[in-house]
Every structure is written in structure tokens, then in C-alpha cells.
Amino acid sequence: MKAVLTGDLIDSTHYELGLLSTILDTLKEELQYLEEVYGCRGWMERGDSLQVLTSEPGRAFQFALLLKAAVNKIGGDEGRKSGRPEADIRLFIGLGEVDMERASLAESAGEAFQLSGRGLDELKRKRINFGIQGPDAGFNAEMDVSCHLLDAVMKKWSIASAEVVYWRFRGLQRQQQIADRLGVLQSSVQRRMEVLGWSAVEAFADRYQLLVQNMQR
């Protein structure tokens, strides 16, 4: 079983060119990071869509939130980091087999690709920005409810929240490490984590990983 993450920028036609350019450069950097560190394959299309293929489906949620936080933290000087992000991305994770993997992800095929692509289209209809689906009906039922709840939490993130999430999923485990990276006090990072609902994010991540492991047995 593999995971395919498909995403597109939300309302990208309304972004100023400078902001859009920064977002695209950022996403390219993050895709390169995922390729170099985790062996993922990343691909961008039309300037506002992306796809990631990973043979570690248990990490797909981590990768999705890394990309989301990378976009959400863009923009905002020190005076407005408590404000809403200037940009956002819609993401869907599809879990399943990959029957044909070609040099171009656009030409690859399989259950994971189908679920991810169809799932992203369904998100637009439901007006939510995050979802997960796999080959198991019980897993899908739980993810549908959980992703709706998590989406509501993530829609309340500020730029400051996204900064913390980003560095947490970039591997900084301790609050002091994140504080040093951001140039703020550890107590500030702690407050940000409380406000963004980190305990809910962490609980979701743990549950997702457990369910994926069970499906792989």
C-alpha cells in the first residue's frame, strides 16, 4: 500500500503575483525536502496543483500538514502573525495500491491515485479543505468524521500557529527548539500550541498512523 497526496491552492487566482511566486517557490522547496529526506516523489502542475507519492503511507498525514503549514505561514510581519493566513491549500490523501508508476506522476495509475484525485474534487463540493480515504470502509468512516473535525480546527489557525506546526513536522520535537528557531520565548510557543489545538492534531496523527499500520498487516 502507498499513499498519494493531491492538493491545490485555494482561490489562487486572487493572490497577488508576489505572494503566488513565494508560495510556489516554497512548495517546490518542500517537495524537494520530502524527496531528499523521505524518498517521496513530488510533482506540480499548472502552478497551483501538486501531487506527492510516498511508499510510507503512515507518514502521509505528517507530509500533508507540513505542506499546509508551509503555505499558511507565508506572509505577515511581526505585527500581524496573530492574523489569518494569506494563503491556504486543499489536500486529500488517498491510500491504496499503485498499479503503474511511470517517470511522470501524471501518467501513473492505481487505487491511491484514483482515491486522492476524486477525494480532492469531493472536498470542493463539501467545502472542506482536508480529507483521507483508503481501501477499508471502517477506516474511511472514521476518517470522514475525524477530518471534518480537524478541518474545523485548522481553519482557525493563525500565521503564528502555522509556524509552530511547520517546524514541529520538520522534526523539531521540543518547544525550546522551535522557540530558538522562531526567535521567541518557549512560553510563546507553548501558548501557540494550545491555541492551535495541537493536542487534537497530535491525537489525530497517532490514530491515523495506528489505523494505517493495522491495514498493512
Region locations from a protein language model:
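Regulatory and interdomain segments flanking nucleotide-handling catalytic cores
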Residues: 1-217
